[in-house]
């Protein structure tokens, strides 16, 4: 485990998925946009988690972020941790399942579930997650030294 390299790797993954989500939005591929936005947000959160330990192989990260934020002196970053946790909860496991499998109980395919508005919202959340993760990564080590 190399926290610095793991963090950089996850942030690059987040940027790549975010770029694909942006392209999907331009091409009106709503389901694909939400799917890539979910992965961008997930990897942004995993980049933050990687700073302090192993990255869990799960899609639900809000609990890990919450635990991490309680164990470290954060001062000005606590709002960022809260916001990132909320985003990963909204774009978590359920959204991941819906983009890949749809809603089996209602017999709705992923292409029937997602529209322009849901793609726009997911993309906005993914952008925020990526920006927040970058800010935490930039500022947190300095916070730790105090």
State what each model feature region is.
Residues 1-146:
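Terminal alpha-helical segments
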